[in-house]
């Protein structure tokens, strides 16, 4: 790390992680409480309507997504997902993953790989402090599902004002990768 900035050094030490979500220590997601309370109280009136719209968006998205390429059989009972979840089926080539990301980038569609935050938390640097680090072989065999999600899944924002034509555009792009 002598010639690089600390951020670049950490990024190069962990090429398998999204550089925007490398956690050097476990953290708490702290937010200011008063302003969030005011905003939250003002939005409670819309909660049921917003939850229904998110459920409808997600169900519609899954109904149009190619189930030969992507996992679409989620248990959606009681969910109100903030994201449209995209997971390539097991056996997908790394090139297919890269093509999905290039396509999303090319069309300025914001996404995050690995679903929440930094993907497989066992790959995060802070894990070493607890003696929980795993070898590549252990990750691939003992945590195969987590590794698949880490490497072959994304989420795109799902919000109450998301229009069907935007969902259709996203689905058409994904289905034609």
Predicted regions and their residues:
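PLP-dependent aminotransferase class I/II
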Residues: 1-177
